[in-house]
């Protein structure tokens, strides 16, 4: 930790101890972490002298909307409780970048692709997409469960597609998913932008997904 007022986290203060996984209930990526720092000093608790105490640290990250939260569980012989740790902006950035790096190392895909692929493969309802404005952002939702699959600030390209017919498609055996505006024949997002572009879609017989 940095030697500042907040004891600010640094990347060396934690490790992803188990594999990250998609949380279908909360629509985020669940990341178990090891605490390599003084939890008493950082969280203002007092367990250093309790041999029965155990701290479980984890983060929940949604790369589509850019939301990340951190929680810790305290388990002792006499009590157990969970609390959220409210990160500073600097810590939020540090931990987000670390999660992105570890996702690439372990899954060989960006967090966004991991999130969307896992969501699609575990979704237990039909996927009917709608593009609409919410506050100062424009989002593509699954209307059946409220999951956000893509987002841009208002004024960007996505805002031009509000009210249009939006579909989810996949192409070939590459397990590449894309979000498309059928009215404009435009790809709004591809889960693997390096391997697929608009020309690839024109050359391949893409099939719409009805789930």
Range-by-range predicted roles:
Residues 207-211:
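Non-Sec secretion/translocation targeting segments of pathogen effectors
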Residues 5-13:
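Amphipathic alpha-helical segments
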Residues 145-153:
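Short aromatic-glycine motifs in intrinsically disordered, low-complexity regions
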Residues 203-205:
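Acidic, Ser/Thr-interspersed intrinsically disordered low-complexity regions
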Residues 24-26, 30-115, 122-128, 135, ...:
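Acidic, low-complexity, intrinsically disordered interaction modules
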